[in-house]
Amino acid sequence: MAQSVPPASSHGQLTVGEVGTSVNSVPYARHEEIIRAPLTYLLNLPGKDVRSKMIAAFNQWLKIPEDKLDVIKRIIMLLHNASLLLDDIQDSSKLRRGLPVSHSIFGIAQTINAANYAFFLAQQELPKLGDARAFEIFTEELLHLHRGQGMDIYWRDASICPTEEEYFTMVSNKTGGLFRLAVKLMQLASESDKDYVPLVNVLGVIFQIRDDYLNLQSGNYAKNKGFGEDLTEGKFSFPIIHSIRSNPANIQLSSILKQRTTDIDVKLFAVGYIESTGSFEHCRRKLVELTAEARAIMENIADGRSEDLESYACILLSKLILYNRLTYKVPAAQVIHGASGGYSTAPKPRILAQQIATVRAPHLQYAT
């Protein structure tokens, strides 16, 4: 879904002495177009717009004015896409939503600059909310976001497998940060005295675990970002953490992560191993558990009004969480024990072969 950033004006001209003092010029407008190009490219790629849908869902409770709601949506959209630009560089990603990543087109330096520019474009929107506390909340959550990203990168680059507790802290900072920022800004503009942050914290963790699961299990995800991209990145995702820690003596999976492999057969081996340790099933169980927790929080928010609960549960759970669709899994691997006490895995090929066919011969629809 194409989105837009606040436009630059294109009227008038500047003298040399006026440079930097006005945005009402043709050169300024052209320069803006150049500076924002990596961001604009990303915004024009088709997406699910999950965060805007989440904001709209929460606004059924918070009921803030439309003008302020639009400002908050713009802030979150800018920050989210800025973080994606940087993520793709930091993760050496090749695809985003099925098309080349921005830095493959515009270069790393220009893409970093566009991402940083977007952070400040978002900050520039804050005064429109009319509450000085917005800047403090904005700063706090961006610090959380960078702390989470920093630890995620550190574990990957140092080949250190975190505990699940450390993972949840990282996710709360990194993924939950923008969810939390949106809801906190909305609460500033709302007359409601209820705190929705506990709910959004749970939703952030659900969203990330689901994303980690789909990265290794979804054919559609493979088409859009590449099959098993987390394995190529060397990322300690939720199923990978569980799999490694389920049998620390077996170093096969941790060794594969260090290789940053793009080899499909090696990735298939890794996915089969993760399945053999029950780690995908662990993801599904954790998502059911977290969804029940989210549901309990919503019941408390709804104060027993069943019609409200069902309405919001439908929006927040059915459209955003979708845990009940995570029933697809890799066919059970055939485990072959070797003389050394280790083992190799041979996943049954049918469904995984369909995934690989998608990866090796993707049908890409180019954004216009």
From Swiss-Prot:
CDD domains per record: Trans_IPPS_HT
UniProt GO BP: alcohol biosynthetic process; mycotoxin biosynthetic process; terpenoid biosynthetic process
Applied relevance: Diterpenoid pyrones display various biological activities and FDDP E shows anti-HIV activity. FDDP D and FDDP E show also inhibitory activity of 42-mer-amyloid beta aggregation that is involved in the pathogenesis of Alzheimer's disease.
Binding site for Mg(2+) 1: D87, D91
Cofactor note: Binds 3 Mg(2+) ions per subunit.
Functional pathway: Secondary metabolite biosynthesis; terpenoid biosynthesis
Knockout-associated phenotype: Reduces the production of both diterpenoid pyrones FDDP D and FDDP E.
Record field: catalytic activity: isopentenyl diphosphate + dimethylallyl diphosphate = (2E)-geranyl diphosphate + diphosphate; isopentenyl diphosphate + (2E)-geranyl diphosphate = (2E,6E)-farnesyl diphosphate + diphosphate; isopentenyl diphosphate + (2E,6E)-farnesyl diphosphate = (2E,6E,10E)-geranylgeranyl diphosphate + diphosphate
Enzyme class: transferase
EC code(s) of this entry: 2.5.1.-, 2.5.1.1, 2.5.1.29, 2.5.1.10
Cofactor(s) annotated in UniProt: Mg(2+)
Binding positions for dimethylallyl diphosphate per the UniProt entry: R96, K174, T175, Q208, N215, K225, K235
Keyword Coiled coil: no
GO MF terms held by the record: (2E,6E)-farnesyl diphosphate synthase activity; dimethylallyltranstransferase activity; geranylgeranyl diphosphate synthase activity; metal ion binding
UniProt-annotated binding residues for Mg(2+) 3: D211
Binding site for isopentenyl diphosphate: K48, R51, H80, R97
InterPro entries per the UniProt record, alphabetical: Isoprenoid_synthase_dom_sf, Polyprenyl_synt, Polyprenyl_synt_CS
Alphabetic keyword roster: Magnesium, Metal-binding, Transferase
Residues where Mg(2+) 2 binds: D87, D91
Stated family: Belongs to the FPP/GGPP synthase family.
Functional note: Geranylgeranyl pyrophosphate synthase; part of the gene cluster that mediates the biosynthesis of diterpenoid pyrones. The first step of the pathway is the synthesis of the alpha-pyrone moiety by the polyketide synthase dpfgA via condensation of one acetyl-CoA starter unit with 3 malonyl-CoA units and 2 methylations. The alpha-pyrone is then combined with geranylgeranyl pyrophosphate (GGPP) formed by the GGPP synthase dpfgD through the action of the prenyltransferase dpfgC to yield a linear alpha-pyrone diterpenoid.
PANTHER family per record: GERANYLGERANYL PYROPHOSPHATE SYNTHASE, PYROPHOSPHATE SYNTHETASE ATMG, PUTATIVE (AFU_ORTHOLOGUE AFUA_8G02400)-RELATED
Protein name according to UniProt: Geranylgeranyl pyrophosphate synthase dpfgD
Organism for this UniProt entry: Gibberella zeae (strain ATCC MYA-4620 / CBS 123657 / FGSC 9075 / NRRL 31084 / PH-1)
The gene coding this protein: dpfgD
